[in-house]
């Protein structure tokens, strides 16, 4: 993210979220990349007080790295562009957390985002993280545990239990990997940490005795290991049980299916859980009765890399929903969720390798039985995949004979293997071309299923590029692009033969796409004279170059949307300040005239339009860069 428009977008996001002081410091660091405090003061034209307060707050939000040199003892500061960009994804993340873990978890995550990082003991003192007191008018219906009478009388019986709600929620977020512990090395850039780790490895007595290639290999291996130790803030240890995070609710129904799986659920879900809470993803009871509070001295922050994994899985699920039945998509969701629990980040490398140079990267294998446990027992799996046994004998009347299991006489004995088989069939459907959403593996005689991340990430990028090309140039251009992508470099004659297009239409499409930068032309001379008549012209499609170009255009479009939003805010500054007053907010009908109400409605519609466009463009950035 070192391009011009990416830096411009990050500065606008910082200004929009934190104000002009943060934006000036961030822009100055962007322009000069790495500065000491005196030089930063000189270039930013800020006072010592402003600069120190601004830097301390920006360091808390991880917007600025700082590093003290071993040579001269001077502290240097540099911007963290990735943390600044993640500001645009905060709303999407909070929406996902609320959908997965509930409203209170989203409120807690929002608070941690607002603070940058926070100590658990400090979070206990915040009033916004305390649940609302029960109403005294008896509007709320029956409470669990026979507490309805005390609530109707207005007694605050939950006051002593309110702090206990924070810690199970923190444990749920930590066990899912959505928050992690803050380490000292996280305040420094990766390059500075790598240099420190390399210096520490080289200073070891056993390493000093090595020479040549052995020394280089030992230093490289030791540096990587030491970096992982210093940067590791994982809090999931001790909070995972049987591969599941504490607080994760397994899908379950009622009746015989629920009774069959009751014993398995007891490992991590309370069997007496109220069915009215099934709409919530987790509850305190599902923590297995663990009410031990987290250590108050732990400092936590948001784990954006893990959240990228969860958001990427949602895109994979959307791809499955487009090309399969809803039942198959739900089975795929269970597999992806199990994989998410054991996947820390989308990619090991920061940059996406070029097409053809990127190796396969399979997810952790998930046992078929584990996927079956994740699927709702009430889900009709057989209804969308047809008959299970195709080779059954047909009688004289043209009908297959009914088995005992169909009549229900042998249902209990065949239900478990039958359901496992059905889940396997749905996953097999997903493994078919063209998307190959799953892959089957047999490990030690155990059937497991995995997902090939890099293949699906490439597929998402190609689909995004094809959608854009079709929208700009039509379906004929899309056909040409697919031919070039599949066959490589082709001359015009061979391209016409494969695409089955008239020369006139083909040349028009190629010319328009070349002017737009989607296809390129390579000249291959047949002799040293390089005459046009003795030259072969090859058309080709380079998805890597186009991806970089589209990504830059997307940054530019997002930047223009943020600039337009800032302009509109400044134009209506006095009016918006009036609407944000504490006496006016929530009472607009009372304090605003009809013309002002109309203006406020127009402003909200315009703001929603611009922010919605930024969110849509962020989806494209995630596909092109992060997944």
Swiss-Prot record:
SUPFAM superfamilies: Winged helix' DNA-binding domain. The keyword Nucleus applies. The keyword Disulfide bond does not apply. It is found in: Nucleus. Residues 131-162, 238-291, 394-420 are annotated as: Disordered. It holds the Pfam family RNA_pol_Rpc82. Keywords: DNA-directed RNA polymerase, Nucleus, Transcription, Zinc. GO terms for biological process: DNA-templated transcription. One of its GO terms (cellular component) is RNA polymerase III complex. It comes from the Eukaryota. DNA-dependent RNA polymerase catalyzes the transcription of DNA into RNA using the four ribonucleoside triphosphates as substrates. Specific core component of RNA polymerase III which synthesizes small RNAs, such as 5S rRNA and tRNAs. Component of the RNA polymerase III (Pol III) complex consisting of 17 subunits. This is DNA-directed RNA polymerase III subunit rpc3. The lineage of its organism: Eukaryota, Fungi, Dikarya, Ascomycota, Pezizomycotina. The gene is rpc82.
């Amino acid at each position: 993210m070192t391009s011009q428009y990416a830096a411009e977008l990050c500065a606008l996001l910082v200004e929009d979220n934190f104000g002009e002081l943060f934006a000036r410091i961030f822009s100055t660091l962007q322009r000069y990349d790495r500065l000491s405090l005196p030089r930063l003061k000189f270039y930013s034209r800020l006072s010592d007080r402003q600069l120190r307060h601004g830097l301390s707050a920006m360091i808390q939000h991880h917007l600025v790295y700082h590093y003290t040199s071993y040579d001269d003892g001077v502290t240097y500061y540099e911007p963290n562009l990735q943390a600044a960009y993640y500001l645009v994804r905060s709303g999407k993340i909070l929406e996902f957390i609320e959908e997965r873990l509930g409203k209170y978890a989203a409120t807690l995550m929002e608070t941690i985002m607002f603070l940058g990082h926070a100590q658990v003991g400090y979070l206990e003192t915040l009033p916004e993280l305390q649940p609302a007191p029960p109403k005294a008018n008896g509007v709320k219906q029956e409470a669990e545990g026979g507490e309805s009478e005390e609530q109707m009388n207005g007694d605050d019986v939950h006051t002593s239990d309110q702090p206990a709600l924070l810690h199970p929620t923190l444990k749920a977020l930590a066990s899912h990997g959505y928050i992690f512990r803050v380490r000292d090395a996280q305040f420094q850039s990766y390059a500075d940490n790598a240099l420190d780790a390399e210096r520490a490895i080289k200073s070891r007595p056993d390493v000093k005795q090595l020479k040549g290639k052995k020394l280089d290999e030992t230093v490289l291996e030791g540096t990587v290991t030491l970096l992982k130790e210093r940067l590791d803030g994982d809090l999931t240890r001790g909070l995972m049980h049987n591969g599941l995070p504490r607080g994760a609710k397994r899908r379950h129904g009622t009746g015989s299916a629920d009774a069959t799986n009751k014993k398995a659920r007891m490992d991590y879900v309370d069997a007496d859980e109220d069915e009215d809470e099934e709409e919530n993803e987790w509850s305190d009871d599902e923590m297995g009765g663990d009410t031990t509070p987290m250590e108050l001295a732990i400092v936590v922050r948001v784990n954006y890399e893990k959240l990228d994994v969860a958001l990427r899985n949602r895109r994979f699920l959307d791809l499955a929903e487009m090309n399969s039945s809803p039942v198959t998509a739900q089975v795929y969701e269970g597999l992806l969720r199990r994989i998410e629990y054991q996947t820390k980040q989308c990619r090991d490398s920061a940059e996406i390798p070029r097409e053809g140079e990127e190796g396969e990267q399979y997810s952790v294998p998930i046992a078929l039985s584990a996927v079956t446990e994740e699927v709702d027992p009430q889900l009709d799996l057989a209804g969308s995949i047809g008959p299970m046994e195709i080779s059954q004998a047909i009688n004289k009347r043209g009908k297959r004979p009914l088995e005992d299991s169909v009549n229900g006489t042998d249902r209990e004995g065949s239900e478990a293997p039958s359901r496992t088989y059905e889940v396997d069939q749905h996953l097999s459907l997903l493994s078919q071309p063209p998307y190959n959403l799953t892959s089957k593996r047999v490990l030690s005689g155990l059937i497991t299923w995995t997902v090939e991340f890099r293949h699906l990430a490439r597929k998402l990028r190609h689909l995004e590029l094809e959608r854009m090309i079709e929208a700009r140039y039509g379906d004929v251009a899309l056909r040409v692009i697919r031919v070039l992508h599949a066959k490589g470099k082709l001359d015009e004659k061979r391209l016409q033969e494969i695409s089955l297009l008239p020369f006139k239409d083909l040349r028009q499409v190629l010319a328009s796409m070349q002017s737009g930068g989607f296809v390129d032309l390579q000249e291959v001379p047949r002799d040293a004279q390089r005459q046009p008549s003795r030259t072969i012209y090859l058309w080709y499609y380079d998805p890597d170059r186009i991806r970089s170009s589209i990504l830059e255009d997307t940054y530019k479009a997002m930047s223009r949307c943020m600039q337009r939003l800032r302009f509109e805010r400044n134009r209506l500054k006095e009016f918006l300040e009036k609407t944000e007053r504490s006496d006016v907010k929530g009472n607009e009908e009372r304090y605003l005239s009809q013309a002002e109400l109309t203006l406020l409605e127009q402003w909200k519609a315009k703001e929603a339009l611009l922010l919605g466009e930024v969110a849509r463009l962020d989806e494209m950035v995630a596909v092109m860069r992060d997944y």
